[in-house]
Amino acid sequence: MRNKYIEAFENAQIENKSVPDFRAGDTLRIAIRIKEGDKTRVQNFEGICIARRGSGSGETFIIRKIGANSVGVERIFPIYSESLESITVLRRGRIRRSKLFYLRDRRGKAARIKELKK
């Protein structure tokens, strides 16, 4: 059983942040605030959400993109992180799994996900 004070604090943290509705298979653009010395800048990371796990303030999601020289890059982000400037849903994917780890083995056209029809 969780402590009611910790739960109340986590709920207060979650209420302050608005997160769009997205699932695994969606293509996202994440704007990350990066602090270098005394300067801060915003860097975009665009890729497919391959997993979402956890609940409450500890919930995380994994984004995968294909970088330079066809190297796959995956990053794990906490949904309610202060370093996330914004989360934008670019495309909705039509999938039937909650975890898309099989995309790690696929290359090129085989790694595509169909778009969800409205």
Curated annotation (Swiss-Prot):
Q: List the record's Gene Ontology CC terms alphabetically.
A: cytosolic large ribosomal subunit
Q: Which PROSITE patterns match?
A: RIBOSOMAL_L19
One term of GO molecular function: structural constituent of ribosome
Biological processes per GO annotation? translation
Keywords of the record, alphabetical order, are:
Ribonucleoprotein, Ribosomal protein
Keyword Magnesium appears in the UniProt entry:
no
Under the heading Pfam families, the entry gives: Ribosomal_L19 (PF01245)
State what this protein does: This protein is located at the 30S-50S ribosomal subunit interface and may play a role in the structure and function of the aminoacyl-tRNA binding site.
Similarity section? Belongs to the bacterial ribosomal protein bL19 family.
Q: Tell me which PANTHER family the record gives.
A: LARGE RIBOSOMAL SUBUNIT PROTEIN BL19M, RIBOSOMAL PROTEIN L19
What protein does this entry describe?
Answer: Large ribosomal subunit protein bL19
